[in-house]
UniProtKB/Swiss-Prot annotation:
It is a multi-pass membrane protein. It holds the Pfam family Proton_antipo_M. One of its GO terms (cellular component) is mitochondrial membrane. Keywords: Electron transport, Membrane, Mitochondrion, NAD, Respiratory chain, Translocase, Transmembrane, Transmembrane helix, Transport, Ubiquinone. One of its GO terms (molecular function) is NADH dehydrogenase (ubiquinone) activity. This is NADH-ubiquinone oxidoreductase chain 4.
Length: 231
């Protein structure tokens, strides 16, 4: 069920990150070299999850793997145990919680009308649901972490933290962000652009769906422009 996916991606997955933050308090902050294998594993896991997103044909699976890839960056930033790293991890967890939940909501909106989650079968929806296409564009831009979104702030803090710790990590981080932009663009173009493959008429988006997306993106934009609301 889509409600379970939204709660899992927005809350339960982030509780794991919060648990790691609490657990790291019992370890000395000066021995980050001890955690080198875990940091490399977290970054490598983020890249593998992003590569898995590129080969997904199921819309829901693509969004789920996207959430996992972002948590790899969060875990790497937490393990380094610096103020910037913790701030970036918290910012990215909050921002991506809203973003992934919004994407799952949009995926369900598409599924209710097409009865399929296969990307190639849901193309051309901008002809039938132009307002939903706007929501898709905003959610994907947040997923890519464009400035001045909270996603961008979190990823920038994480990037700075990992680069100061080891400049070589910029290669893995840059590759991860490049793949994230690639599959986000692929997801948007596959579901919204191109010729319509659905023969029957679909009903337009309802007010409840617009309200649901507004309740996802308005708090995210408020936090992006006024981050002291959560600090």
């Amino acid at each position: 069920p889509i409600a379970g996916s939204m709660i899992l991606a927005a809350i339960l997955l982030k509780l794991g990150g919060y648990g790691i933050i609490r657990l790291m308090q019992i370890f000395p902050t000066t021995k980050t070299d001890v955690f080198l294998p875990f940091i490399v594993l977290a970054l490598w896991g983020a890249i593998l999850a992003n590569l898995t997103c590129l080969q997904q044909t199921d819309l829901k699976s693509l969004i789920a793997y996207s959430s996992i890839s972002h948590m790899g960056l969060v875990v790497a930033a937490i393990i380094i145990q610096t103020p910037w790293g913790l701030s970036g991890a918290m910012a990215l967890m909050i921002a991506h919680g809203f973003t992934s939940s919004a994407l799952f909501c949009l995926a369900n909106t598409t599924y209710e009308r097409t009865h399929t989650r296969i990307l190639i079968l849901t193309r051309g929806l901008h002809n039938m649901m132009p307002m939903a296409t706007t929501w898709w564009l905003m959610a994907n831009l947040m997923n890519i972490a464009i400035p001045p979104s909270m996603n961008f702030t979190g990823e920038l803090l994480i990037l700075s933290t990992l680069f100061n710790w080891c400049p070589t990590t910029i290669i893995m981080l840059g590759l991860s962000m490049l793949i994230t932009a690639s599959y986000s663009l692929h997801m948007f173009l596959s579901t919204q652009m191109g010729p319509t493959l659905i023969n029957n008429l679909t009903e337009p988006t309802h007010s409840r769906e617009h309200l649901l997306m507004t309740l996802h993106l308005i708090p995210l934009l408020m936090i992006s422009f006024k981050p002291e609301l959560v600090t």
